């Protein structure tokens, strides 16, 4: 599953911002627009027992250039909410459900 960081029109968004995957699938987050973005999972909004630090990018680490990617596999079933730390205040948030 590929998720774009930044809409094609320049909007600060994950595209898609809500989606489903099967446990163990790889999710590739790809910088689409060239603004600095990252992917941080909210430790309070992921399945119990999952370590947010192990699935998130470090908050100071950014995908700066178009085409740069960050990949993650989620094994525990449930709903995970994530955000871009520089743009969370602008509404750049999303969620994935692992089935």
Curated annotation (Swiss-Prot):
Segments forming domain Plastocyanin-like: 1-99
**Membrane topology per record:** Peripheral membrane protein
Entry's Gene3D superfamilies?
Answer: Cupredoxins - blue copper proteins
What terms describe the molecular function in GO for this protein?
copper ion binding; electron transporter, transferring electrons from cytochrome b6/f complex of photosystem II activity
Q: Where does this protein reside within or beyond the cell? A: Plastid, Chloroplast thylakoid membrane
Positions binding Cu cation in this chain are 37, 84, 87, 92
Q: Which domain of life is it from?
A: Eukaryota
| One Gene Ontology cellular component | chloroplast thylakoid membrane
Task: Enumerate the cofactors the protein uses.
Answer: Cu(2+)
NCBIfam families in the record: cyanin_plasto
Give the UniProt family note.
Answer: Belongs to the plastocyanin family.
Q: What this chain does, per the record?
A: Participates in electron transfer between P700 and the cytochrome b6-f complex in photosystem I.
Name-wise, this protein is: Plastocyanin
Q: Which organism is it from?
A: Vicia faba
């Amino acid at each position: 599953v590929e998720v774009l960081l930044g809409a094609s029109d320049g909007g600060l968004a994950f595209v898609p911002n809500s989606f489903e995957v099967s446990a163990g699938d790889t999710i590739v987050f790809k910088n689409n627009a060239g603004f600095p973005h990252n992917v941080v999972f909210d430790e309070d909004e992921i399945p119990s027992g999952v370590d947010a630090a192990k699935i998130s990018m470090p908050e100071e680490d950014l995908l700066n250039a178009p085409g740069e990617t960050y990949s993650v596999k989620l094994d525990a079933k449930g709903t995970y909410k994530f955000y871009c730390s520089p743009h969370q205040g602008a509404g750049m948030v999303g969620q994935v459900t692992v089935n």
